[in-house]
């Protein structure tokens, strides 16, 4: 099959993906075969019901500053904060599936960010697809969260949004780990968080919450304004290693590999 035909097929598949959000059904935090909560809207364990599923999750329904949100100029601050600085460095890391996402955890010292003279140590990063935050109503294909904690137990999360395009350096380097990921940790060796390319020159800042139960509030969110790109192969792999009931995309992926 020639290159033009492959290109046409890719864009047909892409636009089906873009306009078919109901194809994907996400289940998370399983005990045995029973999920504790899901991401599927309008179900008994979907986001609107999280606060009723466990007394410790009550704030998911009653909270006043819940995340994610639509990032608009009227709602949040778009700033260049001189009081924010990043000090990341390469360190040993592992990758695993948590059921609701794929997570890279730094076992060594991956560095920190400093916000208003408070240090927050980098703990882990994970992905959500499609993006949880939107910018002026626009959703993106992928969202990376870099989770940090302070010595006093406070949490700050850096969010980076992605859309399909050129290969992403960070995802490309951990691709083999993503391919084999499961509930058990896989050693990635040394992983450099600087490859994520989080920029501090323009970002959205607001106080919100964790985006999964128990939806704890008081989280400092920093979401980069610039949207990055990533290659579709990494995108599909991340989707496949999370528990999506997605027979359609399994078929598409196998078919596409046969054409390569």
Swiss-Prot record:
It catalyses: hydrogencarbonate + H(+) = CO2 + H2O. Zn(2+) binds at residues 126, 128, 145. Reversible hydration of carbon dioxide. The lineage of its organism: Eukaryota, Viridiplantae, Streptophyta, Embryophyta, Tracheophyta. N-glycosylated. The gene is ACA6. This is Alpha carbonic anhydrase 6. The keyword Plastid applies. Its EC number is 4.2.1.1. It comes from the Eukaryota. PROSITE patterns: ALPHA_CA_1, ALPHA_CA_2. Its main location: plastid. Residues 1-28 form the signal peptide. One of its GO terms (molecular function) is zinc ion binding. Residues 35-260 form the Alpha-carbonic anhydrase domain. Keywords: Chloroplast, Disulfide bond, Glycoprotein, Lyase, Metal-binding, Plastid, Signal, Zinc. The keyword Glycoprotein applies.
